[in-house]
């Protein structure tokens, strides 16, 4: 029997804050994949070095080196895991900037699977996820429908330790379910594309 292909996931965090709970979710997802999901690897893709989108920086169809490197990582990924807080009912400015850079011709997001997770107060970042889904329509991203993952990071008992490490086992299991759904959709889409 042929070995299952390795699904390469690009993990993007909408928060640039060092102690971000959303970055904590990405770190936990990487650990979960390493420990308990065969055939799936997550690479954290740092969006903080990207300049603000400015088409004056595009020269003869090329982009600044940091943007070219980012676009290459997005292009090489089989799918995406977005972790973003909610800012004013939307995704963060840095995440939107990264999305915009990778959507410049040619759009390197297209026809790939994606999942979203978010941690925050109140609704746990849910409205940012719904806005990201709307943006994904234009990008031809295919988001998993279920399970949805919104985490009220401030609700007791604590979900993260003082270093931003996810410690809550139930939350880890919910995150694992998202990853398995993402893996299944990515494999399905790869099968259609190859």
From Swiss-Prot:
Needed cofactors: FMN
Gene3D superfamilies: 3.40.50.360
Lineage: superkingdom: Eukaryota
GO MF terms, alphabetically ordered: FMN binding; NADH:ubiquinone reductase (non-electrogenic) activity; NADPH dehydrogenase (quinone) activity
Enzyme Commission designation: 1.6.5.2
Inducing or repressing factors: By P.infestans.
Gene Ontology annotations for the cellular component aspect, listed alphabetically: cytosol
InterPro entries assigned: Flavoprotein-like_sf (IPR029039), FMN_Rdtase-like_dom (IPR005025), NAD(P)H-dep_reductase (IPR050712)
Enzyme class: oxidoreductase
One matching Pfam family: FMN_red
Catalytic activity entry: a quinone + NADH + H(+) = a quinol + NAD(+); a quinone + NADPH + H(+) = a quinol + NADP(+)
UniProt entry keywords in alphabetical sequence: Flavoprotein, FMN, NAD, NADP, Oxidoreductase
Assembly with partners or alone: Homotetramer.
Family: Belongs to the SsuE family.
Function: The enzyme apparently serves as a quinone reductase in connection with conjugation reactions of hydroquinones involved in detoxification pathways.
Protein name according to UniProt: NAD(P)H:quinone oxidoreductase
Species annotation: Solanum tuberosum (Potato)
């Amino acid at each position: 029997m042929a070995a299952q292909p390795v699904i390469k996931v690009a993990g993007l965090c909408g928060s640039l804050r060092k102690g971000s709970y959303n970055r904590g979710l990405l770190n936990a997802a990487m650990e979960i994949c390493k420990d308990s999901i065969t055939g799936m690897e997550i690479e954290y893709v740092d969006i903080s070095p990207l300049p603000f989108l400015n088409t004056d920086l595009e020269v003869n169809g090329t982009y600044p080196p940091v943007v070219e490197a980012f676009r290459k990582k997005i292009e090489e990924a089989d799918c995406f895991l977005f972790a973003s807080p909610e800012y004013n009912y939307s995704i963060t400015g840095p995440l939107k900037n990264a999305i915009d850079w990778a959507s410049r011709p040619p759009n390197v997001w297209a026809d790939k699977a994606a999942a979203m997770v978010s941690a925050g107060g109140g609704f746990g970042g849910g409205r940012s996820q719904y806005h990201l889904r709307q943006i994904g329509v234009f990008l031809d991203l295919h988001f998993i429908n279920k399970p949805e993952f919104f985490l009220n990071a401030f609700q007791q008992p604590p979900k993260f330790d003082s270093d931003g490490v996810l410690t809550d086992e139930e939350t880890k299991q919910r995150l694992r379910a998202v990853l398995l759904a993402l893996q299944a959709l990515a494999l399905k889409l790869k099968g259609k594309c190859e």
